[in-house]
Amino acid sequence: MKDAGELAEPPGPLPPALAAALAAFERYLRLERSLSPHTVRAYAGDISSMLEHASRQGVAAPEGLGLPELRGWLAIQHESGAARATLARRGAAARSFTAFAYRRGWLATDPGSRLGTLKTRRALPHVLRQNEMAAVLTGLDKAGRQAEAAIAAEAAGQPADAASQRADAASQRTEAAVALRDAAVLELFYATGIRVSELCGLDPGHFDHGRRTVRVRGKGDKERTVPVGVPALRAVNRWLTAGRPALATAASGPALFLGVRGRRLDPRTARRIVHELLREAGVTRDAGPHGIRHTAATHLLEGGADLRSVQEMLGHSSLATTQIYTHVSVERLKASYRQAHPRA
């Protein structure tokens, strides 16, 4: 299937007025709306594609942009095989841009306000069962204790004389440190339900160990305080005490989690860590960090947490976003009923 952004004609340089409008819109998203770099890149890429299409239709400045250009661009995206969710996002990007241009006085009317909203089908998230999650974390805790003991034993021993022995010791120390880090990463994801970008942005100073909470900076640069369970705090402390010093370099800064080169852990690596840990534990469901977030929320609701508390913990701006987890819990209840009730 052709990529949704692939058009029949190669894109050319935008006319100066359109290029300036795109740059202003990108600054607005980044500085005024405080959107994440990922969202800014996605919206800017969408609008760049839309303006390239408009330029080919003879539009040289924002004031020439109208509803036909918007609809024509979205029609091309649909014909190119864009997924329903992608089309919905690109429509939202177009509406955001024209509203921005209208407020700036570049447009006499806002054509995006007349653009229909494409409703996406929200799929129920994949979640792990509580016994599956417990088995994974129990195994990681055991591996973490073994790694901690290995680092302590290596530190207490005599320095190796031969270069090869020193290299082997360093390699084993790094391997043990990575095991401690990975255990803390998964424990913290499950304990808090935070997003992968939020976890990667954490510093040790964000934790209040006495109150068992962590300060998280989420979407829109909004800060919230999230509870952390004892096992997760124990895993984090184990990593900070025994693991992090083995990976830290001058470039590490205050980052909580580090990659093997000593720099702040990036979201891509964090996703890989979670996928690998679950696969090694024999979990067949495809659940990365976002799946663990879904799992944490579902388990909270199954345990009796109220929806508003879960909304606050996850950092959802709308309660409707959190309500999907109630559907997950109901579906699981229905499945259990069908399996267990004699007259189901």
Residue spans for each PLM region:
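Conserved catalytic core of the tyrosine transesterase superfamily
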Residues: 1-344
